[in-house]
């Protein structure tokens, strides 16, 4: 239950111009959920967006896209989730209708649904993400770990796509959080 009507959120107004502002807590549609943010991570995309902008996002826009939290409101048509569930929420969901989705390349989807604005106290999760890319956490997983599930899944996907096996010799050019997650995931 939410006992107030407003929240704080981060908004990127321009390169290197991020501001905290107050806004109404979003109202959800029947197929959406509202999640109280527990942990929101900062990834390379966030840093690049902050430093030089991002072609798909024109300022001002809500900031952040990877997080975990607790469901505080569930839309009337949502199945499989309830108020109080601890969840990890990925940042996109494919349309499942375009050429790329039909050919197993969902990451290239022409109509991805994005979840932006996770640098906020409460996050409204769009229906396609609720249906495809939101997961109830096991009791043994904390929110810090859960907030890294999306980038970790990118690392695992990369390993699978490259068909890397234990004992293979590979060369990696570059370094960053995804590379670190690839290293700890060892096939």
Predicted regions and their residues:
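Short structural boundary motif marking the start of a folded domain
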Residues: 3-10
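Residues that mark the start of a beta-strand
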Residues: 8, 32-34, 169
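Short Gly/Pro-enriched turn/cap motifs at secondary-structure boundaries
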Residues: 13, 24-25, 58-64, 111-117, ...
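Glycine-rich beta-strand-centered segment in the early N-terminal region that forms part
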Residues: 26-40, 53-99, 136-140
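Cytochrome P450 core scaffold surrounding the K-helix E-X-X-R motif
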Residues: 45-47
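NAD(P)H dinucleotide-binding glycine-rich loop of Rossmann-like/cofactor-binding domains
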Residues: 95-173
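Glycine-rich NAD(P) Rossmann-fold beta1-alpha1 loop
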Residues: 176-177
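Residue-level detector of conserved catalytic or cofactor/ligand-binding positions
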Residues: 180-187
